[in-house]
């Protein structure tokens, strides 16, 4: 167990919290991180690419000329692949690029990503993010007080509408919950701001 400073929204220290080394201080497994990031990126692909093969192209039902006697090569349809406007051979078809990863590997990837952020001094623990109403200006002030870079991932224990709406119009700032935490979001951000309760929940799930 290691102690981490807990900050208030004004940037001052309010105390400290003990977090498990098994979640926030392991040696990052780069191979598993690589696989987890590839998996997420593959799942984000639309996979809607499509072309028409010779059966899908319109027309070509009639034989263009008779089989013999013209001196030309025999042809059965003007929609065969060798014709201009004909069907495509072995073209892309709609498909899903997503695949699965074992649960243990997914959790190891998350622990590795969090530990990597801790090693980079890119993890900030705050006591709470209590906003009375969605205020972008107020939330920008909070991030400024916490001395955060432009690309920030904000993690709350559960869905917080005020925080989500406040951060929505700030470029580079993304909000997620402890349950929705994922490797791609963590590694894409320059810094992770996590509430104390969210950190405990992540520790409970991954520990």
Swiss-Prot record:
SUPFAM superfamilies reported in the protein's UniProt record: Ribosomal protein L4 (SSF52166)
GO MF, any single term: rRNA binding
Gene Ontology annotations of biological process type: translation
Key words of the record: Ribonucleoprotein, Ribosomal protein, RNA-binding, rRNA-binding
Domain of life: Bacteria
Skewed-composition ranges (Basic residues): 60-71
GO CC annotations, alphabetized: ribonucleoprotein complex; ribosome
Ranges where the record places region Disordered: 53-76
Pfam family, one: Ribosomal_L4
Function comment: One of the primary rRNA binding proteins, this protein initially binds near the 5'-end of the 23S rRNA. It is important during the early stages of 50S assembly. It makes multiple contacts with different domains of the 23S rRNA in the assembled 50S subunit and ribosome.
Assigned protein family: Belongs to the universal ribosomal protein uL4 family.
Subunit-level organization: Part of the 50S ribosomal subunit.
HAMAP family on file: Ribosomal_uL4_B
Record-given protein name: Large ribosomal subunit protein uL4
Organism per entry: Staphylococcus saprophyticus subsp. saprophyticus (strain ATCC 15305 / DSM 20229 / NCIMB 8711 / NCTC 7292 / S-41)
């Amino acid at each position: 167990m290691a102690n981490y400073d807990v900050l208030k929204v004004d940037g001052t220290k309010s105390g400290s919290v003990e977090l498990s080394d098994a979640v926030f201080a392991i040696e990052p497994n780069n191979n598993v991180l690589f696989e987890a990031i590839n998996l997420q990126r593959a799942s984000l692909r639309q996979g809607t690419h499509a072309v028409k093969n010779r059966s899908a192209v319109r027309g070509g039902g009639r034989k263009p000329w008779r089989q013999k006697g013209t001196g030309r090569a025999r042809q059965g349809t003007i929609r065969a692949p060798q014709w201009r406007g004909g069907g495509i051979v072995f073209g892309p078809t709609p498909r899903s690029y997503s695949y699965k990863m074992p649960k243990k590997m997914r959790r190891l990837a998350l622990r590795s990503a969090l530990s990597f952020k801790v090693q980079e001094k890119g993890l900030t623990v705050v006591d709470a993010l209590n906003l009375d109403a969605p205020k972008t200006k107020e939330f920008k002030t909070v991030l400024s007080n916490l001395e955060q870079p432009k690309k920030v991932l904000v993690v709350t224990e559960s869905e917080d509408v005020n925080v989500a709406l406040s951060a929505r119009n700030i470029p580079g700032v993304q909000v997620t919950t402890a349950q929705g935490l994922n490797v791609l979001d963590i590694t894409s951000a320059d810094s992770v701001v996590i509430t104390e309760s969210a950190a405990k929940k992540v520790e409970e799930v991954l520990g």
